[in-house]
């Protein structure tokens, strides 16, 4: 049995380190990297099990360019919604593999802590529960895994919390205090759940690891790149310069636009996401924050 992680960024590297503890695991990306167990894309696609840790915005293009369906079993470890199409990652993968052949990984998990082998709990979601159990069995003891079948709920939580983390970073950057941040996160959880209900998700997904757990982690720590984007926006830095300086992908930026478009199409009330997008477009963080503080629901 051979596993390959596709994507050699921080998260992909952390997953590779964890999975190689007990299994024959490789790592690959489009560009040659000086990493242990690095293999070419062609070699990686020969593995029976694939873990995708690519940027959500680049996933479709990568699959079109490189993927050859050989019956591989797939774990989607990326978190985001494609901005251009407003499609979730499972919808993108359905163009390439049957739904029985993939699962989604979610939950509170900073790459740095996984690489330190600190205790972590993750959720694996899929309609093929046997495949979920199989992927769960690959992880080492310091990573506790749970399984369920709420794929869309897990994806919405994983994507939405990144936008809320930006909002939380803005709040902290403006030094509005712990009370304001707690209010923002709790109202954000309600907003995220309200959005998710339109897609037939389960309430418990939003209250568990995929939802509340990942949100609380990502929205309260400088280890979160999305939270750091919010901190810098609060200092009146321009988004383009923030992202250039970050030199990493902050999934919450593109995802915010996608959520806003989906919410408008379906008539879903998403005030926090709307204000974050407005800030991206030039609205002052002070005005946007005041608008949120005045919201009644």
Swiss-Prot record:
Entry's Gene Ontology cellular component terms: cytosol
Alphabetized PROSITE patterns for the sequence: NAD_G3PDH (PS00957)
Keyword Amino-acid biosynthesis part of the UniProt annotation: no
Gene Ontology terms for molecular function: glycerol-3-phosphate dehydrogenase [NAD(P)+] activity; NAD binding
Binding site for sn-glycerol 3-phosphate: 79, 107, 109, 161, 214, 224-226
GO terms of biological process kind: carbohydrate metabolic process; glycerol-3-phosphate biosynthetic process; glycerol-3-phosphate catabolic process; glycerophospholipid metabolic process; phospholipid biosynthetic process
Pathway(s): Membrane lipid metabolism; glycerophospholipid metabolism
Keyword Lipid biosynthesis: yes
Catalytic residue positions: 161
Catalysis performed (reactions): sn-glycerol 3-phosphate + NAD(+) = dihydroxyacetone phosphate + NADH + H(+); sn-glycerol 3-phosphate + NADP(+) = dihydroxyacetone phosphate + NADPH + H(+)
EC number, UniProt record: 1.1.1.94
Residue positions binding NADPH: 11, 33, 79, 111, 225, 249, 251
The entry's keywords: Cytoplasm, Lipid biosynthesis, Lipid metabolism, NAD, NADP, Nucleotide-binding, Oxidoreductase, Phospholipid biosynthesis, Phospholipid metabolism
Top class in the EC scheme: oxidoreductase
Protein location: Cytoplasm
Similarity section: Belongs to the NAD-dependent glycerol-3-phosphate dehydrogenase family.
HAMAP family: NAD_Glyc3P_dehydrog
Stored PANTHER family: GLYCEROL-3-PHOSPHATE DEHYDROGENASE, GLYCEROL-3-PHOSPHATE DEHYDROGENASE [NAD(+)] 2, CHLOROPLASTIC
Known role: Catalyzes the reduction of the glycolytic intermediate dihydroxyacetone phosphate (DHAP) to sn-glycerol 3-phosphate (G3P), the key precursor for phospholipid synthesis.
Name of the molecule in the record: Glycerol-3-phosphate dehydrogenase [NAD(P)+]
